[in-house]
């Protein structure tokens, strides 16, 4: 080597040595406060002093600094490198004068192959509606939108470089020199990518980039140290080879293929996934690990791990979930080399070895129901109650682990749910309270509004996808389409600004302290936009497991929407009648009889097809031949149970058709129904026992919710006890049985009888049966469990039960506030506000921690039949008689004009004393009656300390037939009139079956609910008759509707059931004349008897009737129908047709129309 060159090299070495000494002598100044550092070279750290900050708030500030969008913000977290600790989003940093914390802002939640360049792993994307539609239609389309925005990709690239160089992502281990050489070349290839990216991003010339930049800055420190140990000539050769390769790469590959910065980043990061170990994975090394499972026959069993759970590690991986394995020995090769072969084949073998490296999958994120943290111990619960318990070395590590699983759950399963209250982000908690979504895109907001019915004033709240301090309110507005002359929905977006002062609608001046207060203010205003006026009416809050662009999807995890099972798709195992033996009668279900039974073993030839090797005790639910009309609904229940496979649901063996009977064959569960089991116990059941039952039930319902399946009748009598757990060994074990006959085929009376288990919306319309109905039922069942199987509302009549819902009453809840809150969240009258079953399980565990004391006897519920005078708001008079009047009122206890309309009957002041007994009698009668063709009793309202009373009834806005028929004559045909007649007869037949006679049946007292339904009203003259007498003698001197009365009523003042039949004949005459005043019964009879008044009217009327004169045949009335009317007007009561025969005759006529 020439002397000059040697001297020059010597000077360079001296300069390096001086710089190194100077760096060693430099003492950094001690930092104060809290600093957040970034990996982007041009981004200065954030500094915070004396205050309290949550990790989530700090992450928002960091995201703003790095221009990361709100959509990608939840991929990041704060990391303290010196402690190797990630902080949970709700962690509070208390910064004082003595605080010195250095944090790094890092992407924590990572999904390998997010770039989609690997042909081996499933691609990752954000969900889109087009993807959702393609799944529904089984079409193959392009995947959804990219996971990362541009700023997140830039940051991940910088973070990836930092991790690669510092060894935070160590390269995969090697065994041979050849493998080591291959790794070394790949690392130099990474340096080529990094230097090229550096040159292009800084507008430096690509040619000669290697001469200006040393490759040593872009390879791992460990490799640098290895190269330094080699001789000088080897280092020179490596440097020259690298420069030549870099120049060739830049001059040919980059320029010829038009490769940009994005391509370089993706190639760098995708290579990092295969070159290193641990990218996208976090590994925890607990002091102790337990994995347990639960079975029916025995308590929870710990899976054999050995070493008492020590020596194990747990991995959390974004694309698969949670796994565990035994720690590998220090000298054991865990992940072997990436083979030298073709790229795809090599990657496949490498990935296979990674999968085969001893990891046992515990759970994917969608299988997790909740997480519990106690000190340093974290317990993860799956839907099947299998658990993993990690005992970590300190609590911060436990919180970090829980926050990691919780974060991945929100990214892959439900963006608006948290698994653990100890690490719940405050933003998620507040969003749930406010009914606000995360930063979903406009496409999903509009899609949701369409699903909700596109009602005007319906709106969706969502955080902005681009700005951190704005909430977007997307509202449905109705606009007239001038071309088609029809109203069409339009979707308008309004910005709500958030700031330290509160919330305000963008463009206005007034801030409100909370979002809820702002919305309450806006709902009272008339809003305008683009010449449209509208009012906010209903918010559409986030729903469990909603699909949106907030969710990260892979092909393996792609959700398959559950469709309602079609009749042709009904599926269950068939059992031959010879294979079952029917035993003793166990009781009755809804339209079924229940028997004990035996399922015989099948022949040897059938064993391989699911036969039974020995006799099995079963329960037989028999739908008799008299209910063949609901056989299909019965089979639907069986098909639903056949699709369920959960250890806390009863097993359905199959269905047997025996002659004309259909039989559901279910497993026999030892201790029978839960309600009876609880009532049988002589010693009080412990709170822990009750909570275990509640958790098991909620886990089964969570499983059904994930499968988009509705049970339909959750109650304690449909929960079976398989293990009593009274000896303290493992606790109870329950199974949810089938719901029986679906409510969709039950009568209204049967549905009302199921109050308070049936959800209120299902009482209104059984078509409203959804998963939300099961949540209401669970709330009621939890009440039963708390109170040892007591029956809620057991003393209430059907009308009172219905009123309980109409008044939106609640069951009396236990003293424990948290337990009461859980029940009311399940039993809110708005189905959209009910909790996700995962949230129910989580909250049960939280309440259980408090070990609440539950008093055995519940308090009395609020009586829904008692109305408070101050909440009755009169709207108008409906009618007036001699002694009383009826008013239309709104009962509005909330004072928000949302209360129901009711008809209020009261006595006139001058008649109160003498007529109060009659009004009380009418109240007592109405309380006893419940029929779809009789006006419903709602309650009473006491005034003046009880001296005055009001009768509250349902309001029917169409009025009486006397008013309705003349008004709608053009739209009402003979068939409709026949239908009305049938309904009146059905109501009167029911009245007679309860030993009542109406005494005032007329068109004026038949009210119209809708064009297809009428109801009998005004029971002011109704009397009760004794079974052995059959009639009632009137002793008072009330004004009577004489022209509707039968002769025996006019002559002897005796009233029979047949007397009501006479009045019905007159009423039918009114219907056929459409209540024309010119030919009303009074007008016709007055023409027959001539001018008269007082008692003489009754005398002359009796004479005309005794002569056989009757009302004439109305126009368009057939002879057959008129003959039926004449049979109602037989002179002697015994000869008159009865209501049952009238119903049959009308049904026959209807069939012939």
UniProtKB/Swiss-Prot annotation:
Named cofactor requirement(s): Mg(2+)
Keywords assigned: ATP-binding, Developmental protein, Kinase, Magnesium, Membrane, Metal-binding, Nucleotide-binding, Phosphoprotein, Repeat, SH2 domain, Transferase, Tyrosine-protein kinase
Gene Ontology cellular-component terms listed: cytoskeleton; cytosol; endomembrane system; membrane
SUPFAM superfamilies hit by this protein: PH domain-like, Protein kinase-like (PK-like), Second domain of FERM, SH2 domain
Localisation: Endomembrane system
Modified residues (Phosphotyrosine): 1031-1032
Annotated ranges, domain SH2: 435-540
Domain spans labelled Protein kinase: 580-846, 872-1150
Protein family membership: Belongs to the protein kinase superfamily. Tyr protein kinase family. JAK subfamily.
Protein name, as recorded: Tyrosine-protein kinase JAK1
Organism in which the protein naturally occurs: Danio rerio
Name of encoding gene: jak1
